């Protein structure tokens, strides 16, 4: 495992050890899955590609002076994501499931949370993507 250079972190994507996924199938959200794969397989007629059906948020996890990890405005991010889902006709992920996913991915990737002295944070990008195949034209 390569040591991270906290003073020279890039601004942009950096692979972490894990991500978590929850799939919506048969009118319900499934179980939380831990994954290390960086790609998302999807159908060429996925609604995110044809209709832009996608929602995201951005959160930060900080390490406090006491060493404890804190996540900034977790509930507010869940509410905003739910609001976006309502606007684009996507199933909403409950606040409880959102928190479960964020807490799990932060714990799994804790080694990527910079030390307090750095003033930096781990950026988390929750993403909901419509991957179901659907292309329609109105007549």
What are these regions (language model features)?
Residues 1-138:
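Conserved alpha/beta cores of soluble small-molecule-handling proteins
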């Amino acid at each position: 495992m390569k040591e991270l250079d906290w003073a020279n972190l890039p601004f942009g994507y950096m692979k972490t050890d894990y991500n978590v996924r929850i799939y919506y199938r048969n009118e319900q959200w499934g179980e939380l899955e831990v994954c290390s794969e960086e790609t998302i397989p999807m159908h060429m007629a996925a609604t995110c590609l044809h209709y832009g059906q996608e929602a995201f948020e951005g959160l930060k996890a900080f390490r406090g002076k006491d060493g404890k990890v804190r996540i900034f405005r977790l509930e507010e991010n869940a509410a905003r994501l739910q609001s976006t889902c309502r606007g684009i006709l996507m199933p909403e992920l409950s606040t409880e499931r959102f928190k479960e996913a964020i807490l799990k991915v932060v714990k799994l990737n804790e080694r990527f949370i910079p030390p307090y002295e750095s003033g930096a944070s781990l950026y988390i990008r929750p993403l909901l993507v419509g991957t179901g195949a659907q292309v329609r034209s109105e007549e």
